Amino acid sequence: MKSLFFTEEHDLFRKSIKEFFAAEVHPHVDKWEKDSKVDRSVLKKMGEMGYFGLNVPEKYGGVDLDFMYFTTFYEEIGRTGAFGFGTVVVSHVVLAMNYIMKAGSEELKQKYLVPSVQGTKIGALALTEPFAGSDLKGMKTTAVREGDHYIVNGSKTFISNGHYGDYIVTALKTETGISLLVIDRESEGLTTSKLDKVGIRSSDTAEIAFDNVKVPVSHLLGQEGKGFGYMMESLQVERLAGAMTAIGGMEYALDLTLNYIAEREAFGRPINKFQVLRHKVAEMASDIAAWKIFLYHTSYRLGKESLLSRNVLCSN
């Protein structure tokens, strides 16, 4: 039966992603978790395959495909069950690259977006602070303009890709309000501390301190004081990517469950023969199917329109 949302090309793309993940991700997940780091070589391969530039214009090295390719990609990331790896990719593409693509100058796009699409530079987004969480109004990190530079002071915490990434899209307070700066991780005065975690260890999570970090004014994303608006627009894509990854993760968990209850025996037969478990599995599968249709519909509409706050918020 023909899909309402996907074409044959989308299906072929899904098949190629599955094959790539089976060859390049699944065999290495345990090692990455043990090492607390995703091998950069796989990220570079993903860049070479065009996976980081699905919705990026061709002039910046992307392939500029419709939004359903984006949806398919993040659903399949979730289905890998490699949630640390998935966090690295989502943080790079959706949290960091997306802001540069939407609000960056031509200079910033050439300097950061192009190598990000190629997988040779990996980005992070820094919003959360130690005493404010993600409460943007309570943000304490500041950027004071002095001539052709901003002087940045403050700290961020729980930043995905914050330790091993190459640049950090940072939200901070300027004289005119909340602004966004692209800051190189190797900048003088910037230090990162990797946090130890119980799970999802292959995704590096960091505390970041800014001590009189000097950032060129040219690294400002969009207009000074307009950062909140940029974040509200970009958060829609972030939430949708997170929801699609979660749906893929649910399918992964359901597949594991089906395999387990087919093998596990009790009272002389596989436990998948017990009606109470069959009902529960059917209920879970129905919930997943309903959420998928809702998210596919939201993705399809978001690809046609610029703002769908209500639908995207419901997806979370």
Spell out what each predicted region is.
Residues H149, N153-S193:
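A short core secondary-structure module
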Residues V93-A103:
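Helix-loop "lid/cap" segments that line or gate small-molecule binding pockets
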Residues G119-L127:
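A short, Trp-centered hydrophobic/proline-enriched beta-strand micro-motif
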Residues M1-F83, V90, A103-L108, P115-T120, ...:
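Alpha-helical interface subdomain recognition
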Residues S116, F131-S134, F158-N161, K173, ...:
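Short Gly/Pro-enriched turn/cap motifs at secondary-structure boundaries
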Residues G50, F73-G78, L172-E175, V182-S187, ...:
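Short Ser/Thr-interspersed hydrophobic loop/turn segments at strand-loop and sheet-helix junctions
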Residues N212-Y230:
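Long, acidic (Asp/Glu-rich), low-complexity accessory segments flanking structured domains
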